[in-house]
């Protein structure tokens, strides 16, 4: 009985050893297969990333080739890449020859390689000069905006405010007086001539009383009030005004050989007080004191020097 039990135990132990030996290599193969599957997954992920980037790169290349095909005239869509690039090179060389030809005919242009940026800058400069304000010189009209060379010229123009075409206004903080004087006999002594400033209120009162229609008409027509500045009157306007004034004084019976005649134009805040004068083409630009004229013409020529005010 003991021997039978011992044999049975030995058989059971042998079967366990055989089963353990048989299960050992199968577990090793499963571990290796798991590792291989992980490595394959990593490799496939890397390949997919590379494929995505490659697809993007190829799509960009195709888009740029399509742009080139649209730029080049008479290009065939079925050509291969090499022949198409050769056609692009030929077209670029043709454009360079044209540019060199036109640059040779205009020596003032720069000899640097031509690019798109300078062409765009020149085109923008021409368009901006077309709408740029140009100052008027002496009221005659607009001058030449860009004389000389095309690229070397920088045109700068400042906006000018002009009240009248022939009377430009120069801005100044203090009021200035433009005086026009005539001396018939320079050797005469000026000691007997009184100053002009005390007679200003009398002239203001006379002009306001005797010429209401003129002051009202000019006050309605000229709405611009000049707070300060200088008006430069042209020589033709000055001579015409002076001749009309001289003629008016001679008609009044004043001897100009014994008098000094001066015309002063003062601009300022007094322009609203109705101190105006008629146009230089009128026959009577000044108003005279009738009482002084009746008393003595010579006394009026020596003591009453009229002062004109203009807007």
From Swiss-Prot:
Claim: Oxidoreductase is one of the keywords in the record: no
Keywords of this entry: DNA-binding, Nucleus, Transcription, Transcription regulation
GO biological process: DNA-templated transcription
Gene: BIM2
Record's subcellular location: Nucleus
PANTHER family, A to Z: BES1-INTERACTING MYC-LIKE PROTEIN, TRANSCRIPTION FACTOR BIM2
Triggers of expression: Repressed by heat treatment.
Tissue occurrence: Expressed constitutively in roots, leaves, stems, and flowers.
A single MF term (Gene Ontology): identical protein binding
Bias (Basic and acidic residues): 33-44, 51-60
bHLH domain span: 45-95
Stated role: Positive brassinosteroid-signaling protein.
Binding partners and assembly: Homodimer. Interacts with the N-terminus of BZR2/BES1.
UniProt entry tagged with the keyword Transcription: yes
Name this protein carries in UniProt: Transcription factor BIM2
Region (Disordered): 1-60, 271-311
Species of the source: Arabidopsis thaliana (Mouse-ear cress)
Disulphide bond pairs: none
Pfam families: HLH
GO cellular component: nucleus
């Amino acid at each position: 009985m003991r021997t039978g039990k011992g044999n049975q135990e030995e058989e059971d132990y042998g079967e366990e050893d055989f089963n353990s030996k048989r299960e050992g290599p199968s577990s090793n193969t499963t571990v290796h297969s798991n590792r291989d599957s992980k490595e394959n997954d990593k490799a496939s992920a890397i390949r997919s990333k590379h494929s995505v980037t490659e697809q993007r790169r190829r799509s960009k290349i195709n888009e740029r080739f399509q742009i080139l095909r649209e730029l080049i005239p008479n290009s065939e869509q079925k050509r291969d890449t090499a022949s198409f690039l050769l056609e692009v090179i030929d077209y670029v060389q043709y454009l360079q020859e044209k540019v060199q030809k036109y640059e040779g005919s205009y020596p003032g242009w720069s000899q640097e390689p031509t690019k798109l940026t300078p062409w765009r800058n020149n085109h923008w400069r021409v368009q901006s000069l077309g709408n740029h304000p140009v100052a008027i010189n002496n009221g005659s009209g607009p001058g030449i905006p860009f004389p000389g060379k095309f690229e070397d010229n920088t045109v700068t123009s400042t906006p000018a405010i002009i009240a009248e075409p022939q009377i430009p206004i120069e801005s100044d903080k203090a009021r200035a007086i433009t005086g026009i004087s005539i001396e018939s006999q320079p050797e005469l002594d000026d000691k007997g001539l009184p100053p002009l400033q005390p007679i200003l209120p009398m002239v203001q009162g006379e002009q306001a009383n005797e010429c209401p229609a003129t002051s009202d008409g000019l006050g309605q027509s000229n709405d611009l009030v000049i707070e300060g500045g200088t008006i430069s009157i042209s020589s033709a306007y000055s001579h015409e005004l002076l001749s009309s004034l001289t003629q008016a004084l001679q008609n009044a019976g004043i001897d100009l050989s014994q008098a000094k005649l001066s015309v002063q134009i003062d601009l300022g805040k007094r322009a609203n007080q109705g101190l105006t004068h008629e146009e230089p083409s009128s026959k009577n630009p000044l108003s005279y004191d009738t009482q002084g004229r009746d008393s003595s013409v010579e006394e009026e020529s020596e003591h009453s020097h009229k002062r004109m005010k203009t807007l």
